[in-house]
Amino acid sequence: MLAKGLSLRSVLAKGCQPFLSPTWQSSVLATGGGANISTNSPRPFNEIPSPGDNGWLNLYHFWRENGTHRIHYHHMQNFQKYGPIYREKLGNKDSVYILDPEDAAQLFLSEGPYPERYLVPPWVAYHQYYKRPIGVLFKSSEAWKKDRLVLNQEVMAPEAIKNFVPLLEGVVQDFINVLHRRIKQQKSGNFSGDISDDLFRFAFESITSVVFGERLGMLEEIVDPESQRFIDAIYQMFHTSVPMLNLPPELFRFFRTKTWKEHAAAWDMIFKKADDYTQTFYWDLRQKQEFSKYPGVLYSLLGGNKLPFKNIQANITEMLAGGVDTTSMTLQWSLYEMAHNLKVQEMLRAEVLAARRQAQGDMVKMVQLVPLLKASIKETLRLHPISVTVQRYLVDDLVLRNYRIPAKMLVQVANYAMGREPSFFPNPNKFDPTRWLEKSKNTTHFRYLSFGWGVRQCLGRRIAELEMTIFLINVLENFRIELQSLHDVGTKFNLILMPEKPILFNLQPLKKDLGTTTNR
């Protein structure tokens, strides 16, 4: 049970009822937003619906409900109970939760020039205790802005993104060949099984290729065990973060718990390998005089003396750590939804093949000719967001739904719950990419927050979007994607949302020659 009287089945039932009560729905649909529903004076913060002010009692109930790994369902249940805004204190952490896109718009439009988001407590504790250098993920104010403006030019600007296309295309083609090898090994004409490990390696090879301009060989038949340890460390870092979210990480460190030791060891490995890669590629790049291709983000940063070397190292480490599990998980969910919805898969394949003909194989042009495919990535992230919330600390007092929320309060937009709310997404359980192509005066950009919003949105957003687009183009050209079982796969919160159990695919090649990709 999620909570007394409300089962998980009731929350996730097909054709589910809206989380918002009819009264709340009519307010949302009639006014298009929450803060202007009432013309009365704003109500005080303590009147926001809440399970109670005893944070430790709330945390006890949260644990009893197994909320730690099911926090996205916990949010949904609370919106059912309290309406479109509620506050909850877990331990000593107090937050306000919202799910209406119009409320999200008000939140983000008030964030100021130096937005601050929630920082994962054990990550902060590790960096502070071991005095590790920090990049834009942890920085704030002018220090954050200085680094971020430089990095935006390297990884967010349209001209910079074009440089990444040939690098990512080569990685994707090698991944397609990995799948063909798997098919040959099974000797059945297709591949059946779990490809999550291959996707992790693909994502790591992709981000290192963009950052360093060189390949690590993660998609070869024999993989460097040291590089694999880096991937394993990232997973361990996410996994061990969860138990320390609602209790002070310093307690785990003080008592030398297994959780803290494993967490610190994971970060140690991440920093060690990231530093090894950065130093190795740095000296290789310095010895080269000319480049026949784009040499990568690291060289571009170093060549212009745009940031101190320690800042570059810290930001490169954060990019590598954030570019593996997140992207690979979204790709896995994308393949899952395509396999669950074969008609949609065929529509996507038809668009890709038409784009290939029109662009004559030019991938830079192709990625501009697949709007439905890009919409399918949005639709995947609506149903399976990487982060269950997007957060901001208020700069000033803010009135939402006629409640005054004080400055410095943490406000969280519940991504997962928003994506499942019928008031904002009709027939929310249906995988329907076309919903993102429809033009309507009632839609808002703030329905899609998977990469955050504004100047503090995900730094790797453009890399991830390009990487996923090129990946799906090539997979759709080469394989028909099916599932071994059509039973729904549940999700668990492991700091990011992951499948509760392995997803087992059936991949059927669309070309007779299994040794080559369709576009070589």
From Swiss-Prot:
State the species of origin.
Answer: Mesocricetus auratus
- Subunit field text: Interacts with FDX1/adrenodoxin.
* Function description: A cytochrome P450 monooxygenase that catalyzes the side-chain hydroxylation and cleavage of cholesterol to pregnenolone, the precursor of most steroid hormones. Catalyzes three sequential oxidation reactions of cholesterol, namely the hydroxylation at C22 followed with the hydroxylation at C20 to yield 20R,22R-hydroxycholesterol that is further cleaved between C20 and C22 to yield the C21-steroid pregnenolone and 4-methylpentanal. Mechanistically, uses molecular oxygen inserting one oxygen atom into a substrate and reducing the second into a water molecule.
Molecular function (GO) terms for this protein are: cholesterol monooxygenase (side-chain-cleaving) activity; heme binding; iron ion binding
Membrane topology, record value: Peripheral membrane protein
Q: In which pathway does it act?
A: Lipid metabolism; C21-steroid hormone metabolism; Steroid metabolism; cholesterol metabolism
Q: What name does the UniProt record give this protein? A: Cholesterol side-chain cleavage enzyme, mitochondrial
Q: Which cofactor does it need?
A: heme
InterPro entries for the chain: CYP11_CYP27_families, Cyt_P450, Cyt_P450_CS, Cyt_P450_E_grp-I, Cyt_P450_sf
* One Pfam match: p450
Q: Which UniProt keywords apply?
A: Cholesterol metabolism, Heme, Iron, Lipid metabolism, Membrane, Metal-binding, Mitochondrion, Mitochondrion inner membrane, Monooxygenase, Oxidoreductase, Steroid metabolism, Steroidogenesis, Sterol metabolism, Transit peptide
Membership in a protein family: Belongs to the cytochrome P450 family.
A GO cellular component term found in this entry reads:
mitochondrial inner membrane
Q: Gene for this protein?
A: CYP11A1
State its location(s).
Answer: Mitochondrion inner membrane
**Keyword Transcription regulation in annotation:** no
What biological-process terms (Gene Ontology) are attached? C21-steroid hormone biosynthetic process; cellular response to peptide hormone stimulus; cholesterol metabolic process; cortisol metabolic process; glucocorticoid biosynthetic process
Q: Where is the transit peptide?
A: 1-36
The domain of life for this entry's organism is: Eukaryota
Where heme binds, per the record, is at: C458
Reactions the enzyme catalyzes: 6 reduced [adrenodoxin] + cholesterol + 3 O2 + 6 H(+) = 4-methylpentanal + pregnenolone + 6 oxidized [adrenodoxin] + 4 H2O; 2 reduced [adrenodoxin] + cholesterol + O2 + 2 H(+) = (22R)-hydroxycholesterol + 2 oxidized [adrenodoxin] + H2O; (22R)-hydroxycholesterol + 2 reduced [adrenodoxin] + O2 + 2 H(+) = (20R,22R)-20,22-dihydroxycholesterol + 2 oxidized [adrenodoxin] + H2O; (20R,22R)-20,22-dihydroxycholesterol + 2 reduced [adrenodoxin] + O2 + 2 H(+) = 4-methylpentanal + pregnenolone + 2 oxidized [adrenodoxin] + 2 H2O
Enzyme Commission number(s):
1.14.15.6
The record's section on SUPFAM superfamilies has: Cytochrome P450 (SSF48264)
